[in-house]
A protein has these predicted regions:
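N-terminal Rossmann NAD(P)H-binding glycine-rich loop of SDR-like oxidoreductase domains
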Residues: 26-44
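SDR active-site strand-loop-helix element
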Residues: 31, 55, 79-83, 122-128, ...
Length: 309
């Protein structure tokens, strides 16, 4: 049985919200603030009593060592790195490979250096793409085995962050939030009367950005031990095709309009496609042991669709 206790030392919790009316809990730098998770963090952090500063490209490039070295870290308590190059297929191209390694490895190296030098807590977002997907359930102790450039660059960035004494490496998967995402794409197809072919042999659970942000805030305020945590939605394990069928049904269409296919069938004849892990299911025992209860992803999907329809 896998050990559920993180290997790092106990974290130092920031003041709990509400223990002194009006007291701020700390200043947080959020990188990748314009992304799905970044937007959720910028909304929820102030509600939890934090003062967040959000940065993103092109104004701030975390892979620029000189810029990060000259950044005024005075007064910051936490860095949350939600910045990443996430174009999985694009990372397989010569230019994409360079951009992926720059954002996903060099950037975290620079942030880890700053965190160590200034005594900050670094929260870094990772992905199930650091695994090959051959294991049905991924624990925090699983050895990285990335299949493509994106996963390789993320695994290297994770390694850099892991040497930071005060770090939370948060591994997640299948994120849904503000902006373009799989659920919105399927809903658009349903509304236009399109019957899609959707991959059925890749399995996992959706993670809603607001729930992911809430889990991160829990880690930095609860005194949870530093180290690696899996954090995704909970509930039934589904395929992309299963989720698409649920979207079609909620939109008033027949789920039979969605045709399940294998990954190999879906990408047949296409070039430059990155390999995907077939299992994206994360073991959530460790994050639950800290007192955080991940939301049921199917229930959250229903609520999300109600808001969209």
């Amino acid at each position: 049985m896998n050990e559920t206790k993180p290997v790092r030392t106990e974290g130092t919790s920031l003041p709990r919200a509400g223990h002194d009316e009006g007291q701020m809990r700390g200043r947080v730098l959020v990188t990748g603030a314009n992304g799905q998770l970044g937007r959720a963090l910028m909304t929820l952090l102030p509600q939890a009593g934090f003062e967040p500063t959000g940065v993103d490209l092109p104004e701030v490039d975390i892979s620029d060592a000189a810029a990060m070295s000259s950044w005024d870290w005075t007064g910051y308590d936490v860095i949350i790195n939600a910045a990443a190059w996430t174009n999985v297929d694009g990372a397989e191209t010569p230019e994409g490979r360079r951009l992926s390694w720059r954002a996903n490895t060099v950037g975290p190296v620079n942030l880890a250096r700053a965190a160590v030098q200034h005594g900050l807590t670094l929260v870094h977002l990772s992905t199930e793409y650091t695994f090959d997907g051959a294991t049905a359930l991924h624990t925090e102790e699983e050895t990285p085995s990335p299949l493509g450039v994106y996963g390789q660059s993320k695994a290297a960035g994770d390694a850099a962050v892991s040497v930071c004494p005060q770090h939370y490496l948060v591994r997640t998967s299948w994120v849904v939030g503000d902006g373009k995402n799989f659920v919105k794409t399927m809903l658009s197809l349903a509304e236009r009367g399109i019957s899609p072919r959707v991959v059925a042999d890749q399995t996992g659970r959706l993670t809603f950005a607001s729930d992911l942000a809430a889990g991160i805030i829990h880690l930095i305020t609860s005194g949870a031990e530093f180290g690696t945590y899996n954090l995704s939605g909970d509930g039934p394990i589904l395929s992309w095709a299963d989720i698409a069928k649920r979207v079609y049904e909620k939109a008033g269409h027949s789920p039979d309009e969605v045709t399940p296919v294998t990954t190999e069938e879906y990408y047949a004849g296409q070039e430059g496609i990155a390999p995907r892990p077939l299992s994206s299911v994360l073991d959530l025992a460790r994050i639950k042991a800290t007192g955080f209860s991940p939301a049921d992803s199917t229930e959250r999907l229903n609520v999300y669709l109600q808001d969209l329809l």
